[in-house]
């Protein structure tokens, strides 16, 4: 697994990024845990609050003259002469250019596109606010963390001292009842100093996974583009 980290550091460094390869001791120092064998860090990285960021983008777009229609699912897209005809339950729209950015929620509007990804059900969870002592010992630098496991471990802090983590769906029966225990156990394996783990908030949805783990840009027709397959990193990749 360290070969993956070494490869990433080499790739990013060639492009001028400020990156650092971490041995086990340095990783333990940064994360407050000996759970990982090593890793790498992008020193210019950061985190955003996704909902606040989305609202900010919407406000900026509206300020530049964009019109945003919510609760208006497009049910079909067809070429009509030199434009595209988009139908919704309440009306129609004609456009010179169309961008389909529905990712894991791509439906029968573009069936071939839908079959190009694997929808994976992903859960995220936020703990109760944790004590100052815990916050000083668990990822004290407040970096966002993820690893190379298939069902990767990931962690980040919120402004009010909650640890956010999660997992992909493995349980078909009662997932919201069973996952908190599963994820809580993972937290304690990585950070036993947290003690009892309880989650105040749980949210979930689909991510669009691709076989090569890269997002795909498709040209579906004249002026008709699709962006799909963000593999759980849509906020960063789409920005």
Could you describe each region identified by the protein language model?
Residues 2-5, 20, 46, 50, ...:
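Generic structural signal for well-ordered, non-membrane alpha-helical segments
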Residues 11-24:
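A short alpha-helix-loop-beta-strand transition element characteristic
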Residues 199, 216, 222-239:
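Conserved mid-domain beta->alpha element of the FAD-binding
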Residues 26-34:
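Flexible hinge/switch segments at interdomain interfaces of large molecular machines
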Residues 20-22, 67-69, 198-202:
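General small-molecule cofactor/ligand-binding pocket signal
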């Amino acid at each position: 697994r360290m070969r993956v980290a070494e490869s990433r550091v080499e790739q990013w460094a060639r492009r001028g990024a400020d990156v650092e390869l971490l041995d086990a001791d340095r990783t333990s120092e940064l994360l407050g845990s000996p759970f990982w064998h090593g890793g790498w860090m992008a020193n210019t990285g950061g985190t955003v609050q996704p909902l606040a960021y989305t609202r900010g983008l919407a406000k900026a777009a509206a300020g530049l003259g964009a019109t945003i229609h919510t609760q208006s699912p497009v049910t079909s897209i067809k070429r009509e002469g030199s434009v595209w005809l988009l139908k919704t339950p309440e009306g129609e729209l004609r456009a010179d250019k169309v961008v389909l950015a529905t990712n894991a929620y791509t439906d029968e509007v573009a069936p071939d596109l839908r079959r190009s990804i694997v929808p994976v059900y992903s859960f995220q969870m936020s703990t109760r606010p944790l004590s100052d002592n815990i916050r000083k010992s668990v990822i004290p630098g407040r970096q966002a963390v993820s690893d190379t496991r298939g069902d990767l471990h990931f962690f980040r802090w919120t402004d009010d001292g909650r640890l956010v983590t999660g997992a992909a769906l493995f349980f078909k029966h009662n997932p919201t009842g069973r996952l908190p225990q599963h994820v809580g156990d993972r937290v304690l394996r990585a950070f036993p100093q947290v003690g009892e783990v309880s989650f105040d908030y749980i949210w979930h949805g689909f991510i669009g996974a691709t076989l090569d783990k890269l997002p795909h840009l498709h040209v579906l027709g004249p002026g008709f583009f699709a962006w799909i397959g963000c593999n759980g990193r849509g906020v960063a990749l789409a920005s």
